[in-house]
Amino acid sequence: MSQGNLYILSAPSGAGKSSLISALLASDSSTQKMVSVSHTTRAPRPGEVEGVHYYFVSKEEFESLIEQDLFLEYAKVFGGNYYGTSLPAIEENLAKGIDVFLDIDWQGAQQIRKKVPSVKSIFILPPSLPELERRLIGRGQDSEEVIAERMSKAISEISHYDEYDYVIVNDDFEKTLKDLQSILQSERLTKDYQQKQNAMLIQQLLAK
């Protein structure tokens, strides 16, 4: 069975990351793909489903998982709630040949690279700051104050783009989606990947 690849996907709010992930999962059935479901200690919001949006656990349960070193990465955010990525769940899905995407920020990405050096990371850039602000306003979800905070945070996040393996400017949604698909395809054609997947064939070809 083919081994799946682990990907980090990061972007400032408004760059189109969530829409791209949804479109990517719905396209090209030649490879299995999924987004990792995180654990959190916060209460479920209306419409959120256990195991689909998050795994909702108590603070005590979360801290027990930390002590057992069962998180690939985790963080305690403003308000005191924990968020984390389960290591056993990731390993299980990768072993099934599923490409797993981690929708996390640059800080989480730094944690994961230390534990999984083979992870591939992708950063989505907006075409410009004015366009990013226009998209945030167009969503109609946030106040002017919150949008200003998101814009300030976006500049900080963008400054870490050079820590990533791939960088894509989301100026044209369909083109960006094709770029993401190309990355997935090319990563399954690397020498390291093929040596693992076709070890027996290579051994047979070199037997004489």
From Swiss-Prot:
It comes from the Bacteria. Residues 4-185 form the Guanylate kinase-like domain. It is found in: Cytoplasm. The keyword Kinase applies. InterPro entries: GK/Ca_channel_bsu (IPR008145), Guanylate_kin-like_dom (IPR008144), Guanylate_kinase (IPR017665), Guanylate_kinase_CS (IPR020590), P-loop_NTPase (IPR027417). It catalyses: GMP + ATP = GDP + ADP. The keyword Cytoplasm applies. Keywords: ATP-binding, Cytoplasm, Kinase, Nucleotide-binding, Transferase. GO terms for molecular function: ATP binding; guanylate kinase activity. Its EC number is 2.7.4.8. ATP binds at residues 11-18. Belongs to the guanylate kinase family. This is Guanylate kinase.
